[in-house]
Amino acid sequence: EETDEAEIQEENTLETNTKITTDEYFTNSRLERNTMYSQQIENYQDILSNTNVSEAQKKVAQEEITRISNEQNAIMIAENLIKTKGIEDLMIFVNNESVNVIVKGNEPTKEEIAQIQNIITRELNADIEDIHIMNKS
């Protein structure tokens, strides 16, 4: 009987550690993504404030700042909309033409995948074939 209790305790510890690891993954990923966007914007703001930079380069820098800000807003909106569909947590990463969605927990159902694709295509103007959905449990 002691062995059973020890095994149960060990299983509970493993479940707790997995949950913490998954929670940390989403927290750290969100922090890294926000830091990356902030650094990109800061780099473009440096270009804008540099007196040795041409007006054409400044225009491109301003367009990039706007694009990054719009992308950040679209990601935030999409993540929040997807959470209203019952997904506990998720991360959206946009890389050139592809959108990677990492969903917390079990593999999403066909219905959840369709809802995620619908929201991503609408909010991020992505094509369905460019949306890649995975889970992290």
Q: Language-model segments: which ranges?
A:
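Envelope-exposed proteins and targeting segments
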Residues: 40, 44, 78, 86-90, ...
